[in-house]
């Protein structure tokens, strides 16, 4: 009888173990096909190491929900302040996004544009590694070192009119030999948010430690080109949280400031870096979102001083040169300077603009 009881107990234990294993396996392979199903209570715990891929999965699913695979999302208007899906977007360029299955080969074709105008194509891989930009018109092959899909960001400079942008966008095309949907393992939303907030909170410390020149080095790189020499795991994680979809330094150099109080007035006076494309300065709130339609000035829009330098003012009133309003509910603001196709002075000599920021007065 004892042997029978023991045998039954062992059988029950084995069945229970197998059941638990099946439940664990089910949890492990929960797959999301939409952004809505990406977050799950039983999803995988997000860590700083996994965050770049996890945030990229979320972005891919979001675009797939909107247009499916091998399709464009065009905006022939500059980014509206009431619709900013990604932190630190800007109004210096018009955006098109494409979500493409490249598993069996794919290419993208861009139409002719007038000489001197800016149009760039930037592929982002599933693990948030950033390929170097391609410029101008032509047909460009698309490949990836990992996964099966690419997120492609296309930028047209703000000197185009909305009508001109629409005509250009209508002539863009995708040629792909496969159209399989993208899927991702589900993740736990609480851990995702905790990690994201912790990464964003590290930036002031990194700015203090590395300085304005080196703070963003290593955030946006490709394992298959020379940018890999700049890669660090820490900066890779920070880049995904602070500026998902950012560009390689050869294409765009970013300068990020700390937070400034909105109680004061500030000015930046600097020499023109003479970038191959243009520079821009954009104002954000504490969380990294624009809060006014007039959120930026660029070398295409700012009025230069008589000596060829530029002054951009922040919260100094309408009579101040190139003034940007800084009032917003967060009580602080920060800026990002972007160098599009940066000059040798910016790349090789580390010329930066943010260090010239000075408090002028307490009056707005």
Indicate residue ranges for each PLM-predicted region:
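A compositional/structural signature for long, glycine/proline-rich flexible linkers
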Residues: 22-364
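Bacterial signal peptide processing site
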Residues: 18-20
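C-terminal motif of bacterial Sec signal peptides marking the signal peptidase cleavage site
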Residues: 14-16
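Sec-dependent signal peptide recognition
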Residues: 2-7
